[in-house]
From Swiss-Prot:
GO cellular component: plasma membrane
Keyword Chloroplast included in the entry's annotation: no
Name used for this protein in its record: NADH-quinone oxidoreductase subunit D
Name of one Pfam family that matches: Complex1_49kDa
Amino acid sequence: MSHVHQAGEAFASNAAESRQEIRNYTMNFGPQHPAAHGVLRLILEMDGETIMRADPHVGLLHRGTEKLAESKPFNQSIGYMDRLDYVSMMCNEHAYVRAIETLMGIEAPERAQYIRTMYDEITRILNHLMWLGSNALDLGAMAVMLYAFREREELMDCYEAVSGARMHAAYYRPGGVYRDLPDHMPKYKESRWHKGKALKQLNASREGSLLDFLENFTVEFPKRIDEYETLLTDNRIWKQRTVGIGVVTPELAHQWGMTGVMLRGSGVAWDLRKKRPYAKYDAVDFDIPLGKEGDCYDRYLVRVAEMRESNRIIKQCVAWLKANPGPVMVKNFKVAPPRREDMKDDMEALIHHFKLFSEGYCVPAGETYSAVEAPKGEFGCYLVSDGANKPFRVHLRAPGFAHLSSIDSIVRGHMLADVVAMIGTYDLVFGEVDR
């Protein structure tokens, strides 16, 4: 019996030593987690509920976009740009077409520049509404998602009105935009859900042109933002989940190459629309919202304020576009397709159209970097041409990639539940991170 007793004591002693040795454990967060915002895989080293280290794994959505763009004529790769950050479609297009225009030495007409400015801001609101709804849903505030998507639907209809597509528009073209703004808006049709007075009410703001619709939207949208703020800004639970969480100091933001809201939320007034104006941002009036503490709550406040500023810009663009009709594409027929009326009467115009969209055009040899202030930060396109009709090199700077690199230093010491809040406030889309 004494031998059995001694063996039991030895086993208990070894088990206790093993428990003392095993302090940290590893947890996989994603890529299937609903709060991973795509295909993010985080390998977390945990000490109880506290995060000791975070190792982000990327590449699960890598599609070789840069090499695909290098295998196509310049004007055939615009559609690939939409599929990078697939929540900020036209901003991606803008960086790419600006790079081509710089190499070719052409400038889009003034009306096209105002249209681009307006749609960049429509895209910013689309992105921030998606962010607001999904981040609030991740933290347990379900109603905000429904409110945000109500306005998002209206702006998606503005995409559809100019391009025929609700997401992948391919509306921006080197030298301008695909076509001028339409005189009508898509309308709801009668169905078992929409009929009678309800249908008329839905279509009341869609009787006029796209600009009329947007003019009405800019009047109503600030009231909608007030509704979001009523639900969240002073909400006790929302503040408990975001105040003091994921603090990014200005020094840390600079070290990690952060841009956009991640930088401005820390109090750094850097915005390409002000510092390096492009399109017509130097002709419109707007402010740069800034945070103070650099935490998740500040970044929420900055994004909400940015939606208000975007609304101001859209309002100014609508007023200018209503008063100033004009061309939306350069008259350089090396890059601009012939008019459809000409193609029906002139064989040369038909041949030119076919050659333009099958072979493209040769871009003078050179290199350039073109960047825009996308909703998530600085989205840039480095473009190298060797004089052929295809790019020699395309490199895309995705803001989310730089931001994700910093996640280990930001999440250390936080609780597991705070990871969801921090990933949400990064506003990641893996189409652009993995490219």
